[in-house]
């Protein structure tokens, strides 16, 4: 019996078979999950950086951030004096007038001083502002200490209200021991009021109490 003639194998024609998609889909899912995790970590780090930055500035006086204390220093004031100038600014969108009652005073290092700012709301409605602050030279930030300040809280003013606000502060005696401050003769305390757009409804705060007698 004669075998059937063998024909040469013809090359395959048409579109090759599509490989299975499951492995690629799984890889895409893993990549997407990894990217999502990285984004979440970056967002979380950004939010965590804000309170850390604020704490760092308060702890070190970085960028002219002042310190906060509840009581006056226990040591007696030094003989050395320094001039403290007072600056005031209003951010756009806040219809207030804001200015210091004194533009400059001289204080002894370690002496507690009280100064006053006045603010007037020119709007026809109650408005709320929050004051940001710093001191220059920036090296002074870790020594300039506030005991009381209107900048600690938001300020809500009734239409047309004028308010007197106090700042109680001292320059820490350790300021004089820092060689970086040997040439510092003047410190500038600067405030800028910014509008608070989403302030919670609350009664308009009472005016500052009458100032105590005596000079600064």
Swiss-Prot record:
Key word Cell membrane present: yes
Origin: domain of life: Bacteria
Transmembrane segments: 27-49
An example Gene Ontology CC term for this record: plasma membrane
Gene it is expressed from: ctaG1
Membrane topology of the entry: Single-pass type II membrane protein
The protein's name: Cytochrome c oxidase assembly protein CtaG
GO molecular function: copper ion binding
Main location: membrane
């Amino acid at each position: 019996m004669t075998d059937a003639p063998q024909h040469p194998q013809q090359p395959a024609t048409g579109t090759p078979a599509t490989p299975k998609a499951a492995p690629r889909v799984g890889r895409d899912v893993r990549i997407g999950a990894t990217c999502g995790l990285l984004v979440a970590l970056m967002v979380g780090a950004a939010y965590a950086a804000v309170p850390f930055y604020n704490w760092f500035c308060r702890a070190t006086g970085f960028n002219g951030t002042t310190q906060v204390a509840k009581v006056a220093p226990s040591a007696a004031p030094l003989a050395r004096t320094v001039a403290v100038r007072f600056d005031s600014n209003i951010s756009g969108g806040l219809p207030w007038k804001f200015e210091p009652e004194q533009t400059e005073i001289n204080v002894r290092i370690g002496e507690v001083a009280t100064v006053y700012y006045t603010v007037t709301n020119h709007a026809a409605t109650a408005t709320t502002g929050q004051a940001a602050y710093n001191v220059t030279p920036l090296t002074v930030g870790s020594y300039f200490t506030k005991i009381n300040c209107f900048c600690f809280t938001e300020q809500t003013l009734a239409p047309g209200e004028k308010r007197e606000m106090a700042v109680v502060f001292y320059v820490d005696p350790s300021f004089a021991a820092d060689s970086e401050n040997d040439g510092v003769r003047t410190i500038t305390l600067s405030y800028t009021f910014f509008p608070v757009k989403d302030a919670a409804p609350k009664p308009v705060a009472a005016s500052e109490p009458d100032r105590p007698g005596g000079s600064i």
